[in-house]
Each structure stands twice: as structure tokens, then as C-alpha cells.
Amino acid sequence: VPPSVARALQYFRGLSREEKMQALVQYSKKLEAVPERFRNLDRADFAIPECQTQVDLYPDVRPDGTLHFYAAVDARRSPTIAAFLAILLGAVNDQPPATALGIPGDFARQMMDSIGLGAREAGLNAMLARVKRYAAQAAASAPTGSAPTGSAPPGGAPGQRAHS
């Protein structure tokens, strides 16, 4: 992990939840503006479609072989994403490609855990898994593929755990 990333992770681990939210806003303000030369390019080539937030990432290979990235993201609406990018890009900008390649694959998870949002992410995943499990059970038990309205969740009464 690049030293600046390690420092950021450690910094967030020592903050209260309110302080973390304030720090996210501060980090989000550190993103550089996207230079004019990138603004006229087709953003589809630089969009990150996997992200729910609209993010465009513009790479710039410098004459000395180092990399510099610019990110277009609405930091006001998505301070967590902007802060994550500011920390990540702060570590890899103006560095050789090996620095970016050395970022651990679980960096996002480490960041989310350090920021204190890992549990929220896990909770959202668990809720989605539960909804999908209920939907699959309902589809399997309903002859027409639709569950009757007003029925209890598949597997039991409301609040009970469905068995798979």
C-alpha cells in the first residue's frame, strides 16, 4: 500500500463517525478539476459504468512515463466517492504505473471499512440477498410466477426468517 493510502486509512480509523463524514467532505475537495482538453472528449470512453454515481476517469501518461488521473464526479452529491478518488489518485498521480498496479485488490473494502461504511455496505448486500431469496421462493411456489398480494414473506410470517 502506498504510504499516503496507509496514512489515510489509519487517519479514518481514529475518527468518530461525525469526524469521518467531515473528513470525507474535506478529502472530496482535493480532487483536481478536469483540464479543458479532456472536457470535449466522448465521456463514454472514460465513464465508470459499474459505479452508481456518474464518474469519469481520465488517464494522462506523462512524457516521463508517470501517470496522472483526473476524475469528474459531483463531490457535493457523492462526497464518499470523491473522497475515495482523491485518496486513490493522491497515491498514484505522478508515479510510475507500478505504484497503481501495487494497490491491493481489496483497497475499496479497506477504505469502506476504515471510513466506517463497510457495515452499511454489507447490510445493503444482505438486504438485497434477502429480497432475492424471497423473490426466488415466491417464484418457485407460485404457479403463475406471481405471489398473492398481502401474503407473508416466503418461508413464514413477517419478521420470521425464510428457510432455504
Where are the regions a protein language model picked out?
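Intrinsically disordered, low-complexity terminal tails and inter-domain linkers enriched
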Residues: 140-162
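C-terminal binding/interaction regions
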Residues: 110-140, 161-163
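Conserved interaction-surface patches within small, structured recognition/assembly domains
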Residues: 60-78, 89-93
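Amphipathic alpha-helical interface surfaces
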Residues: 20, 53, 80-85, 96, ...
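Short beta-strand elements
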Residues: 53-61
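Extended low-complexity intrinsically disordered regions
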Residues: 1-45
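Glycine-rich phosphate/pyrophosphate-binding loops
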Residues: 94-110
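A short catalytic or substrate-binding loop motif that flags glycine-/basic-rich loops and adjacent residues
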Residues: 48-52
